[in-house]
């Protein structure tokens, strides 16, 4: 049977994109609370617009520690400064910061605290469905379209921060279209990069800056025809960031996950402590799907879980290997249940999610990253692959 030929596209946005500015500020607040109390409950949203940042949400600490509004506001400024915003319309030092963060609802608290609520175990912070995914089309076990989209913007950000190309400003987006034969990418059909720049920089100058970065990211010989290499297709892009578009936490959930190659349960990650299963269970299902693929049990794997607020264990676990499985999906699902405690406490303990590790997740994707010495991206480890393989086989 001939392999199905098709195109697929994913996009990414840079750290300076207004929605990513908001995500990074929200996660800086999460890290601030967890650094003082690892059991903190945090749900903080950020809005950023022309020289203004607004913080709102609900928080609670359990060990008597206090995070002041001034500390939260300073964390927001530090994020904007690190990104590099020093423009008239959005400047880390000049922007106003409004803080409307207040205490967590007692009714929510009783559902997520051990020993309280109808069920005495620590329950999920909300109901919902979460998905994890992995594919062997890249070493990261991620969709190639998204990997390349992220890497293009990461390299451009490194170039901007180095000072070697002062014409680049923080806001940027990328998009990569690949040609697939069956499940394998075989070439690039189009690349789009929209990058904010200083006034007076021509489109051709910008193309000459961006072209070598794109070429370095893509496999050799995959650079698209010039007419399919789009740089700032509307012309100039001087007004950008929160001065050009209002940014909000949680609006880039497909960029954050699998670039459209897998389902999404709808819940955003940034601004949430790990008692929120929107975040922690999505990390756990990625960890499990990645380990299933790393174990050679499938070349593609999607996992869905569901939760009820206040209930510890997931209501359902679904494993789909998309016809690539080397074992029955029911056996794989059974092994997952045996090897990994998918309660909020079990996830948090296994993946060490109570640490202040969330800042780096808020730009360039939560998945496909390298686990760090500081405990970041623990869900990207493949240390469960051997046990999974043994149990399934």
Curated annotation (Swiss-Prot):
Database matches in Pfam families: S-AdoMet_synt_C (PF02773), S-AdoMet_synt_M (PF02772), S-AdoMet_synt_N (PF00438)
GO CC aspect terms: cytoplasm
EC number: 2.5.1.6
Entry superkingdom: Bacteria
GO MF entries: ATP binding; magnesium ion binding; methionine adenosyltransferase activity
Keyword list, A-Z: ATP-binding, Cytoplasm, Magnesium, Metal-binding, Nucleotide-binding, One-carbon metabolism, Potassium, Transferase
Classification via PANTHER family: S-ADENOSYLMETHIONINE SYNTHETASE (PTHR11964)
Subunit architecture: Homotetramer; dimer of dimers.
Function: Catalyzes the formation of S-adenosylmethionine (AdoMet) from methionine and ATP. The overall synthetic reaction is composed of two sequential steps, AdoMet formation and the subsequent tripolyphosphate hydrolysis which occurs prior to release of AdoMet from the enzyme.
Similarity section: Belongs to the AdoMet synthase family.
UniProt-recorded name of the protein: S-adenosylmethionine synthase
């Amino acid at each position: 049977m001939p392999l199905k030929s098709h195109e697929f596209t994913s996009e990414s946005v840079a750290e300076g994109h207004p929605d990513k500015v908001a995500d990074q500020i929200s996660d800086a607040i999460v890290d601030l609370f967890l650094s003082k109390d690892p059991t903190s409950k945090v749900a903080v949203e950020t809005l950023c617009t022309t020289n203004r940042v607004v913080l709102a949400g609900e928080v609670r600490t359990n060990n008597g520690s206090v995070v002041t509004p001034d500390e939260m506001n300073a964390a927001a400024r530090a994020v904007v400064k690190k990104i590099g915003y020093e423009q008239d319309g959005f400047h880390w030092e000049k922007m106003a910061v409004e803080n409307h963060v207040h205490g967590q609802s007692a009714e929510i608290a009783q559902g997520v605290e051990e020993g309280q609520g109808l069920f005495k175990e620590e329950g999920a912070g909300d109901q919902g469905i979460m998905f994890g995914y992995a594919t062997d089309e890249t070493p990261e076990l991620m969709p190639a379209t998204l990997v390349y989209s992220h890497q293009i913007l990461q390299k451009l950000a490194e170039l901007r921060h180095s000072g070697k190309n002062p014409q680049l400003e923080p806001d940027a987006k990328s998009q990569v279209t690949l040609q697939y034969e069956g499940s394998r990418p075989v070439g690039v059909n189009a690349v789009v990069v929209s990058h904010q720049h200083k006034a007076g920089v021509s489109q051709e100058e910008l193309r000459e800056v961006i072209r070598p970065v794109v070429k370095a990211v893509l496999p050799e010989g995959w650079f698209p025809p010039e007419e399919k290499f789009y740089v700032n297709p509307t012309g100039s892009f001087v007004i950008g960031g929160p001065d050009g578009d209002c940014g909000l936490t949680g609006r880039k959930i497909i960029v954050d996950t699998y670039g459209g190659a897998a389902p999404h349960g709808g819940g955003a990650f940034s601004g949430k402590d790990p008692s929120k299963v929107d975040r922690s269970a999505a990390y756990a299902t990625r960890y499990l799907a990645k380990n299933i693929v790393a174990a050679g049990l499938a070349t593609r794997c999607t996992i869905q879980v569901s939760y009820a607020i206040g209930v510890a264990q997931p209501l359902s676990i679904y494993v789909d290997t998309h016809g690539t499985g080397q074992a029955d999906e029911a056996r794989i699902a059974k092994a997952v249940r045996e090897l990994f405690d998918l309660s909020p406490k079990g996830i948090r303990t296994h993946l060490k999610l109570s640490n202040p590790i969330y800042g780096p997740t808020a730009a360039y994707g939560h998945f496909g990253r390298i686990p760090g010495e500081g405990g970041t991206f623990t869900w990207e480890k493949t240390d469960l692959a051997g046990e999974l393989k043994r149990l399934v086989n």
